């Protein structure tokens, strides 16, 4: 009984003939038809195309998806006749097929479709190579295999340059949203402080307008600043710095400054 990985490895073995017949490629000499194993790559490429059309607003979306599904079904029939098993097209996607590949150098399972694992220049020429994870082949030469194998294969679908623009837009919106909230809260806090300061100044001004101030008929209590001194701790309890007012009234330093 064949497994999906058996089918994928068969396709990789025949990949150099997938562009045949083509006189420009020396390996195609005498080959009149591409091997049926190449249907695996056709399905994988169609699945990528289907994924892109699935989330578009193009008016031709339904028509295009219908045609893609028909093409996928044709290749699925070819593979069923070849291997005698029913292969789900969803299993033949680039990021899933990667699990089946073997690192020729170490024997470990390869995580991505990188040249050092597959030697797949022929696939690239045929247009079958999937978009590598950000960093491309450079990342596979810069990082050890143990590190690379810790990267979840499924993320290849989302961590590629073609899709990354959407995540960058979302990230930018989140950053702008946070910035907006912080600025709004800061402005509101400053506005409240300014409002309280105006109330304090108004309070002082009203007290100074007493016509009997500094006379025997003064309406203020014996300590003209008593009410003001009682008001300062109230504002300090709300987090305001009242150091200047304390200094003017001869009070000891307080908190929040």
From Swiss-Prot:
Its main location: host cell. GO terms for cellular component: host cell membrane; membrane; virion component. Induction: Expressed in the late phase of the viral replicative cycle. It is a multi-pass membrane protein. Keywords: Host membrane, Late protein, Membrane, Transmembrane, Transmembrane helix, Virion. It is found in: Host membrane; Virion. The chain crosses the membrane at residues 123-143, 163-183. It comes from the Viruses. Disulfide bonds: none annotated. Belongs to the asfivirus C257R family. This is Transmembrane protein C257L. It comes from African swine fever virus (isolate Warthog/Namibia/Wart80/1980) (ASFV).
